[in-house]
């Protein structure tokens, strides 16, 4: 499901040519004006395709926290489970974006469960480390992927996206076991 704030979708044609089923929601944001359309689109995808995974690309103008709430609200009515919120950050512009976009960018970073750094293939180790440190200040728990685009596989991205859920499940299991032992 792709959400473009403008009236014309940018990526839809390319994705369709690649054989990816896409449902476009244009001229608004799924976290506010298009939430009803989003619910219908998500329900259609679930019922028609029965997918293992749905990728939702929101518009670039909504806060990730608002988008997350919209997705959670829709998910309450469907048999879907939220697993990951991914954002991409340009290794060369993290500092500038934090300064120029403030709350909007901070919200994007702080609510992501996985942050993929882009443009790392030409960045120095120092530049990457500095970007990671700035991101960690805003989000100490997110998985941060620094692998260069040309070396990054879809499998690696999926693993990074699911790491936190696996860790959370492991912690819950450990807590349950500890409670059983003390009962």
Residue ranges of predicted features:
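Short, ordered loop/turn segments at secondary-structure junctions
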Residues: 3-5, 120, 149
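Short acidic, glycine/serine/threonine-rich loops at helix termini
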Residues: 68, 99, 156-160
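Non-catalytic interfacial helical region
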Residues: 71, 92-101, 109, 115-117, ...
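C-terminal accessory "lid"/substrate-recognition subdomains
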Residues: 107, 111, 122-183
């Amino acid at each position: 499901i792709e959400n473009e704030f403008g009236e014309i979708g940018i990526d839809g044609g390319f994705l369709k040519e690649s054989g990816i089923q896409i449902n476009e929601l244009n001229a608004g944001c799924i976290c506010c004006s298009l939430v009803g359309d989003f619910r219908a689109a998500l329900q259609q995808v679930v019922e028609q395709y029965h997918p293992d995974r749905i990728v939702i690309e929101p518009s670039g103008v909504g806060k990730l926290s608002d988008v997350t709430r919209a997705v959670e609200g829709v998910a309450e009515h469907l048999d879907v489970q939220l697993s990951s919120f991914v954002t991409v950050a340009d290794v060369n512009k993290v500092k500038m974006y934090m300064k120029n976009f403030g709350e909007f960018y901070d919200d994007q970073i702080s609510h992501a469960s996985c942050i993929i750094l882009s443009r790392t293939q030409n960045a120095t180790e120092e530049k990457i480390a500095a970007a990671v440190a700035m991101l960690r200040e805003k989000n100490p728990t997110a998985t941060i992927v620094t692998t260069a685009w040309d070396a990054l596989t879809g499998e690696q991205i999926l693993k990074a996206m699911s790491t936190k859920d696996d860790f959370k499940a492991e912690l819950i299991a450990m807590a349950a076991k500890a409670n059983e032992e003390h009962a």
